[in-house]
C-alpha cells in the first residue's frame, strides 16, 4: 500500500503520533528522570523525614539501599530557583517537535501550530510544590527551614510519594530501565508502574489523616491543582492526555494488583511479569492476568523518494484517539481494545511530513472494528492529507500526510481521551470500593462500552450513572 507521494507519510503518522507525542516530546519532558548511580552508604534521614521513610518501607516492603540527601530551603523563591534548572527545550527537542506537530496534524489530533516542545516544558515546570526530587544530584529538596520544621500534610504526602519512587528505583532500577526502553509501550508501562505505586502509597498515607489534617490537605491539593490547570490552559488537550495516560492507567493497575491474592504481585509486575503494553494495564484481569501477548508487526517501508525520520509505536491509547477521529469514543474504545501491536514511520516526501502505519489486531473481529473506525477517520481528513486505509488479514494499513498548519480540519475534543482514561479511573474506584478486581474490571469495561464518559458526570438526563453502575454490577456478579 506504500505510495510514492507525500500523502503516504502522513498516513503512518496518524496512528503513531500519539506515542510520538508521548515518547518523542514526552521523553524529553521527562528527561530529568534519568538513571543515576546510588551512593553506597547506609541510609539515614533527618528527623522530620525519617517517619515518612519508614512508612514507605513498611507499606511497600521495599528497603532503601542507599543514602538519599535531603536539602531544606525555607525561602519560596530560593526553593524555586534551586529546583527549576531548565533553560527550556533544546534545539533537538524543537526540531523533533516540528515533525511531531506535522504528524499530529496528519492524524487529526490537532490543527495549526501546537508548539509541543514549549507545551512539554510548560507541563513540566508549572505548578507549586514543596518537595522536589533531583535524581541527577541524588537529592530531595524540601521547602522548610530544617529537619526540626513541622511539615504540612500536603508536603508530607508528597514526600511519601517521592520517597516511594526513590525506593522502587533503587530496588528495581526503574530509571535505568526506562532510559533503555526499546518501545514507547515499554517506557509507558514502567512509568505507569512507578507512578501508580507511588500514588497508591500516597493514598494509603493520606487515609490516615485526622479530620483537620484531611481538610487542610484537600484544600491545599485543590488549590495547587487549580494553579496548575490555569497555567497549562494553552496546552492542547490531546497532547495533555498523552502525557497522563500511563499515570492514569498505571494507578488503576497497581490498585488492582494490590488486591490480588498474590501478595508479591507488584514485585512480579516490576520484575518477572512486566506488562507488555498499557492495554494489559487497562484490563489487569483479562489482558494481564491471562497474558494477552503482543502480535508481531513489521514497520512500514519508506516509499521511494522519501527521507526517513523515525519509527514509533502508537499503542492502544494512540489507536483509540485515532479511531475517535472517525467514530464515537465508545466505538473507538471497543475497537482499540482489540489492539495487538503497531508500528509507524514518519518520513518526508515532496516537502511534506507523512506517516505510514501498520496496526495488528488481536483477531478478525477486532480487525473489523478497527478497519471500520479507520475508514471513518480517513473520510474526515482534509483532501490535502490524502489519507489511505488498507487491510491485509488482521493487519490494518494507513497512510496520511500533514495538510499544513493553515488547513481547516476537525480535531479531537476531551470526550475522546476521557472515554479511555475515565474507564481506568472507574476501575480504580471500584477496586477501592469492592476489593474485587474481577468484578471491578467487568463493571468498568461494560459501563464504558455502553455509555459515554460524560454520562458518569451526569451530563445525560436519561442516564443515572449510579443506577447504571449498580445494574451492571449485578450482571457482572452473576457472570464473573
Write out the residue ranges for each language-model feature.
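Active-site recognition of the HExxH zinc-binding catalytic motif
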Residues: 56, 154-174, 195-199, 254, ...
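Short pre-active-site segment immediately N-terminal to the catalytic Zn-binding motif
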Residues: 140-160, 186-189
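N-terminal Sec-pathway targeting helices
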Residues: 2-20, 26-31
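Mature extracellular/luminal domains of secreted and GPI-anchored eukaryotic proteins, especially small
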Residues: 232, 416-480
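Catalytic zinc-binding patch centered on the HExxH motif and its immediate surroundings
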Residues: 79-97, 115-140
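Pan-zinc metallopeptidase signature
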Residues: 230-352
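Post-HExxH zinc-binding segment in Zn-dependent metallohydrolases
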Residues: 52, 169-175, 179-221
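C-terminal soluble interaction/assembly domains
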Residues: 340-343, 351-429, 434, 438
Amino acid at each position: 500500500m506504500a505510495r510514492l507521494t507525500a500523502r503516504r507519510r502522513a498516513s503512518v503518522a496518524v496512528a503513531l503520533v500519539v506515542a510520538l507525542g508521548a515518547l518523542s516530546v514526552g521523553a524529553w519532558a521527562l528527561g530529568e528522570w534519568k538513571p543515576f548511580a546510588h551512593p553506597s552508604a547506609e541510609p539515614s534521614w533527618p528527623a522530620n523525614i525519617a517517619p515518612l521513610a519508614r512508612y514507605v518501607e513498611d507499606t511497600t516492603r521495599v528497603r532503601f539501599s542507599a543514602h538519599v540527601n535531603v536539602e531544606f530551603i525555607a525561602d519560596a523563591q530560593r526553593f524555586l530557583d534551586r529546583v527549576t534548572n531548565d533553560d527550556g527545550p533544546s534545539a533537538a527537542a524543537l526540531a523533533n517537535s516540528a515533525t511531531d506537530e506535522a504528524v499530529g496534524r496528519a492524524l487529526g489530533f490537532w490543527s495549526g501550530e501546537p508548539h509541543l516542545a514549549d507545551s512539554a516544558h510548560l507541563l513540566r515546570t508549572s505548578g507549586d510544590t514543596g518537595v522536589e526530587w533531583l535524581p541527577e544530584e541524588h537529592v530531595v529538596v524540601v521547602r522548610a527551614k530544617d529537619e526540626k520544621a513541622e511539615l504540612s500534610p500536603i508536603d508530607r504526602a508528597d514526600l511519601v510519594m517521592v520517597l516511594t519512587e526513590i525506593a522502587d528505583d533503587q530496588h528495581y532500577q526503574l530509571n535505568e530501565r526506562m532510559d533503555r526502553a526499546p518501545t514507547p509501550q515499554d517506557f509507558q508501562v514502567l512509568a505507569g508502574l512507578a507512578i501508580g505505586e507511588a500514588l497508591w502509597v500516597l493514598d494509603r498515607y493520606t487515609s490516615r489523616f485526622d479530620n483537620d489534617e484531611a481538610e487542610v490537605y484537600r484544600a491545599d491539593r485543590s488549590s495547587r491543582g487549580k494553579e496548575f490547570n490555569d497555567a497549562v490552559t494553552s496546552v492542547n488537550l490531546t497532547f495533555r492526555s498523552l502525557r497522563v495516560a500511563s499515570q492514569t492507567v498505571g494507578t488503576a493497575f497497581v490498585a488492582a494488583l494490590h488486591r490480588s491474592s498474590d501478595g508479591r504481585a507488584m514485585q512480579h509486575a516490576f520484575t518477572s511479569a512486566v506488562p507488555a503494553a498499557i492495554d494489559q494495564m487497562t484490563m489487569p484481569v483479562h489482558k494481564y492476568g491471562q497474558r494477552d501477548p503482543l502480535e508481531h508487526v513489521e514497520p512500514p517501508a519508506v516509499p521511494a523518494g522519501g527521507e526517513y525520520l523515525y519509527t514509533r509505536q502508537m499503542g492502544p491509547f494512540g489507536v483509540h484517539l485515532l479511531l475517535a477521529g472517525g467514530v464515537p469514543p465508545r466505538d473507538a474504545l471497543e475497537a482499540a481494545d482489540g489492539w495487538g501491536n503497531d508500528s509507524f514511520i514518519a518520513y518526508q516526501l515532496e516537502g511534506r511530513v507523512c506517516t505510514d502505519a501498520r496496526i495488528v489486531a488481536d483477531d478478525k473481529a477486532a480487525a473489523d472494528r478497527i478497519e471500520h473506525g479507520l475508514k471513518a477517520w480517513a473520510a474526515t481528513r482534509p483532501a490535502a492529507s490524502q489519507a489511505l486505509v488498507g487491510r491485509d488479514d488482521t493487519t490494518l494499513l494507513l497512510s496520511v500526510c500533514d495538510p499544513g498548519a493553515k488547513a481547516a480540519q476537525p480535531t479531537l475534543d476531551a470526550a475522546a481521551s476521557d472515554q479511555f482514561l475515565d474507564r481506568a479511573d472507574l476501575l480504580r474506584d471500584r477496586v477501592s470500593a469492592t476489593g474485587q478486581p474481577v468484578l471491578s474490571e467487568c463493571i468498568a469495561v461494560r459501563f464504558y462500552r455502553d455509555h459515554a464518559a460524560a454520562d458518569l458526570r451526569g451530563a445525560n438526563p436519561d442516564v443515572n450513572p449510579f443506577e447504571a453502575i449498580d445494574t451492571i454490577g449485578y450482571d457482572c456478579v452473576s457472570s464473573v
